[in-house]
């Protein structure tokens, strides 16, 4: 299902698509997207803008919720789909459309995702997340924390709960409208049959998982080939780099360009290195383009990373790009912009396979220093090669694993046997507070009885002593 107005979703010859009308235009979507990304190159976000950024995100998601309503209110399309007898809904739970369709059609839902804001994917699955060693997103902590860091991490769990209520309040309204029974988005998501999570522990910190959560990090990777299939002119350009090799630079599909002043900082640094640079840049070409830099509105990222002459990957740190870098053992210089990208950068830096720079204060000098540091220090290549070997050393490839479990849910019409009983417990029962209370009551009762017995015995002894004294 594809909305007729979309920035990134389009029809494809590889599968059948159904385009449904929506009440907004692509221009409106582009405007909300622009509002979300404006300012990324200007200054570092601070705590004073925390609420403002959340509201921008809410505005960004609101237009997609309108699209969900347009789909659910399209009775001819919904009736036709119901009659087609679908076996499963495969959806990204970032928006509620897929989960709502699955509930309305009474068919299993398989969620396909990297993660949800404020860790909602873990919360709705009742997956244990002890703050003592699992860092809260955006906290800047690793899985090994000092006492002050654990205090901050614990405090941020409270902030995270507040963030959840802001982000998903309008989701709850939509779920209540179309499902009823006072159901909220958390409850709806908790009935998902399976969760295909685009992550795994080569990149992520070790943590508990539940049986209905399957890690498929690297599903988008292409196997590294000695002769990557590149267009002839691009192959000639990268081969011309000689032993120095070339650099791939892209900030993802959401940011195809940047302010001219910022672009000049990159060009000033690139002209001082011997490597050639392939840069995905869809804006107006910057002035004074060096001979070793080639701009492309679109570039074959997988094939370039798989090329034997690829030396460095300049990326925003999105999970797809990071895993493609890991799969092909290419060190990274990361410019985290939003979402999980900062945490991805922290993980890669901690593992010694990357460095990070802030896009808003990058200059030609600090960029050149970072480029030379990674290109001239062999440890980055050694670390990313080790990560790549670990990532590939698995019994089942991520794509095959995702296919198996999706077909499993289809064959068995769900996976209810993987759903933990924690969903049936309230907060007090889940944390065994009623058990602790019962044990405490028993202990207090025993203590009270013991105390009463001691007092009784003491009084009896005192009375006997008094009677004996009087008789004497």
Curated annotation (Swiss-Prot):
Its EC number is 2.4.1.17. It is a single-pass membrane protein. GO terms for molecular function: glucuronosyltransferase activity. GO terms for cellular component: endoplasmic reticulum membrane. Keywords: Endoplasmic reticulum, Glycoprotein, Glycosyltransferase, Membrane, Microsome, Transferase, Transmembrane, Transmembrane helix. It holds the Pfam family UDPGT. Signal peptide: none annotated. CDD domains: GT1_Gtf-like (cd03784). Glycans are attached at residues 59, 227, 377. The chain crosses the membrane at residues 436-456. It is found in: Microsome membrane; Endoplasmic reticulum membrane. Disulfide bonds: none annotated. It catalyses: glucuronate acceptor + UDP-alpha-D-glucuronate = acceptor beta-D-glucuronoside + UDP + H(+). UDPGT is of major importance in the conjugation and subsequent elimination of potentially toxic xenobiotics and endogenous compounds. Belongs to the UDP-glycosyltransferase family. This is UDP-glucuronosyltransferase. It comes from Pleuronectes platessa (European plaice).
